[in-house]
Amino acid sequence: MSTLLNRLTLLVSFAFSALCLQAADKKPFGLMTDLIEHTGQTWQNGYASNLPVWQLEEAIEPLQYAAIRSSHPAFSWIVPGETGGTRQTAYRVIVADNREDAASGRGNLWDSGVVGSDRSVAVRYAGEALKPGKSYFWRVKTVTNTEGESEWSEVKAFRTADRLSEYETAYYPQVKTMEFPVGITEIRPGTRLVDFGKDAFGQLVLTLASDGTRDSVVVHLGECLEGGRILRDPGKSTIRYHRYPLALLKGTHTYRIKIGKDKRNTGSAAVLMPAYVGEVVPFRYCEIEGYEAPLTPASVVRETVHYPFDETASSFRCSNDTLNQIWELCKYSVRATSFSGIYVDGDRERI
């Protein structure tokens, strides 16, 4: 009897899930404002925060978000439909200055009405100019040639910048990802070479222990190896190398390596890093010299700085390993170098 009940429960669960998925497919999804998808998300110093953008005033510490900089932004969405050849024939967009009205299907700022059109990209807001530094809410429903009228989409929130123009490109804040070594090698007693596997712009965070007999270590950061050690003198090339002495406190402590100023990329014409991120340097390898205690991957962290990047948005795989490696190199290069623009090398394009 219990087995039968379990099976019935499982069948009901599957049926409910299928209905939910079917219902979800009938709503427009993938809503974007000025081509930014995650407009309701906030970040704190590079890491995602749990506070939604419409509760920004409740934050004690500064938060970052993808500010919409246009007084008349454009809305985009993905048209729902399970049938091949599904085409949108009409849409209706509403915009409200509060979540409750939007959730109830009321656009107290703008209601486009039913517009006969197949357009689902860059539908421009046509209400009164939005105000700076405020949160807004919108949603859309569509009519298609195969499914008829859809349900309302989920409510999408966005927040405007402190200064607005008729049109200005919106963008995400820079974010951080914690990365751990793929290998730690003891070069000689007291000296370890840490390899993060790939080069990246970032900062180094170390958790080290000292019994008080050793008061300092030396940290080397670099992009290239020579003879199994980090290349100390890359000459006039754009390969980077940095050396940082680190004084140790007695006990176990976490240290953030302060990146030194480089005259080549911190001049008056340089693209400066935002204060909530701090300075970064490109490196793949780290050498820790003069440290006798055990060193684990968890105690050496690279905080990689990059523009938000969806690893699942594209993929490629074929029978040719060389082509696969070229694809991965190109994909990683976009992620690693696009936080302030597309770079030819480590630092040249931000000078």
Please name every model-derived segment:
Residues 13-22:
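Hydrophobic h-region of N-terminal signal peptides that target proteins for export
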Residues 24-348:
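Extracellular/oxidizing-compartment recognition motifs
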Residues 351:
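Active-site core of glycosidic bond-cleaving carbohydrate-active enzymes
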Residues 1-12:
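Bacterial N-terminal signal peptides that target proteins for export
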